[in-house]
Amino acid sequence: MAAKIKKGDRVVVLAGKDKGKQGSVLQVLPKDNRVVVEGVNMVSRHTKPTQADPQGGIKNKEAALHVSNVAVVDSNGKPTRVGFKIEGDKKVRVAKTTGEVING
């Protein structure tokens, strides 16, 4: 199935501790049906000192969210479902609320 959410999309969290927060997609994990969203679902990781990071310590990073818990934000700033439409010889993503083509 084609990807309805892609890297760089602006999304809003629909459920969980960060419900209502918006951010852009940093990474899509299609095998796990998960996405990593910038500044959302932050977790603390205890890292050992390495040559790349001699300090080590506790670092905050984004954890993956399930795709069903996020929705793409349309041009009006509201969450929308994503559909597909054929324009010429290309298949494009379309916002269900406004009918506009989603860039990406």
Swiss-Prot record:
InterPro entries: KOW, Rib_uL2_dom2, Ribosomal_uL24, Ribosomal_uL24_CS, Ribosomal_uL24_KOW, Translation_prot_SH3-like_sf. Keywords: Ribonucleoprotein, Ribosomal protein, RNA-binding, rRNA-binding. Disulfide bonds: none annotated. It holds the Pfam family ribosomal_L24. Transmembrane segments: none annotated. Signal peptide: none annotated. GO terms for molecular function: rRNA binding; structural constituent of ribosome. One of its GO terms (cellular component) is ribonucleoprotein complex. The keyword Ribosomal protein applies. It comes from the Bacteria. CDD domains: KOW_RPL26. PANTHER family: MITOCHONDRIAL RIBOSOMAL PROTEIN L24 (PTHR12903). NCBIfam families: rplX_bact (TIGR01079). HAMAP family: Ribosomal_uL24_B (MF_01326_B). One of two assembly initiator proteins, it binds directly to the 5'-end of the 23S rRNA, where it nucleates assembly of the 50S subunit. One of the proteins that surrounds the polypeptide exit tunnel on the outside of the subunit. Part of the 50S ribosomal subunit. This is Large ribosomal subunit protein uL24.
